[in-house]
């Protein structure tokens, strides 16, 4: 959903990206059995690592290997992700987390009103995913979505996805003794 919030990727694009993300984590030694509590931010790959892996796959593409994706599909993914991973928008997305304490976190989203749709949608989705994880995995957490209209983006696809995430959070937070508060003008 994060990549779809950024660009209008088809299901085929997302499926290929998921394969590449799995390979990237495997390359970094991260699996379902990894003890994430011992990992530092630098122990995780960043988006440029994903881009490099996809580019490597594209450059060495072997049509006879019966891949689940085509070279053309990889090229389209590279074009769609370039700005986020290597270009002008990489400053927003391509880096390790700078959250050093999780006791009280404020994400100021007012400045996102001036950002282009793809950046705004992806950044809001990133924040919502982080909040969802804290609310539903850690539990005993309160999150506030202020300026709700910003979250309900003018991009129909992103807005619908965000609404679904909010709805799913609201259905499950009580079981984790968490709260989601929404406000707007």
Where are these regions (language model features)?
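H-loop/switch region of ABC-family ATPase nucleotide-binding domains
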Residues: 184
């Amino acid at each position: 959903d994060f990549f779809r919030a950024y660009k209008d990727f088809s299901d085929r694009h997302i499926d290929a990206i998921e394969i590449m993300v799995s390979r990237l984590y495997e390359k970094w030694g991260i699996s379902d059995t990894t003890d994430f509590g011992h990992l530092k931010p630098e122990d995780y790959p960043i988006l440029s690592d994903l881009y490099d892996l996809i580019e490597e796959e594209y450059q060495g593409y072997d049509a006879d290997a019966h891949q689940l994706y085509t070279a053309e599909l990889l090229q389209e993914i590279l074009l769609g992700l370039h700005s986020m991973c290597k270009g002008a928008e990489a400053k927003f997305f391509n880096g390790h987390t700078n959250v050093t304490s999780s006791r009280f976190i404020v994400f100021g989203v007012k400045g996102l009103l001036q950002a282009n749709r793809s950046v705004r949608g992806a950044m809001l989705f990133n924040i919502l995913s982080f909040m969802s994880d804290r609310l539903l995995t850690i539990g005993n957490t309160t999150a506030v979505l202020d300026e709700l209209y910003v979250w309900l983006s003018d991009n129909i696809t992103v807005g619908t996805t965000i609404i679904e995430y909010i709805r799913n959070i609201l259905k499950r937070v009580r079981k984790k003794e968490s709260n989601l508060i929404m406000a707007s003008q």
